[in-house]
Amino acid sequence: MANPKRKQSKRRSANRRAANAFIAPEFAKDPTDGSAFRPHRVNPKNGMYRGRQVLNVEV
């Protein structure tokens, strides 16, 4: 089994762990009803995308 030739520095270890940080998802606000939804996606509450009705959502 391979073994490390040199000790890994604290900076290199921290940089590797930084990729595992949790990033909270951002939300956009719908101008018609004020509901929050993920940007660049269809609003699941009313089926609107960029001002157009693309899904028929039954209320």
From Swiss-Prot:
It comes from the Bacteria. Keywords: Ribonucleoprotein, Ribosomal protein. Residues 1-15 have a biased composition (Basic residues). Coiled coil: none annotated. GO terms for molecular function: structural constituent of ribosome. One of its GO terms (biological process) is translation. Residues 1-48 are annotated as: Disordered. One of its GO terms (cellular component) is large ribosomal subunit. Signal peptide: none annotated. It holds the Pfam family Ribosomal_L32p. NCBIfam families: rpmF_bact (TIGR01031). Belongs to the bacterial ribosomal protein bL32 family. PANTHER family: 50S RIBOSOMAL PROTEIN L32 (PTHR35534), LARGE RIBOSOMAL SUBUNIT PROTEIN BL32 (PTHR35534:SF1). This is Large ribosomal subunit protein bL32. It comes from Opitutus terrae (strain DSM 11246 / JCM 15787 / PB90-1).
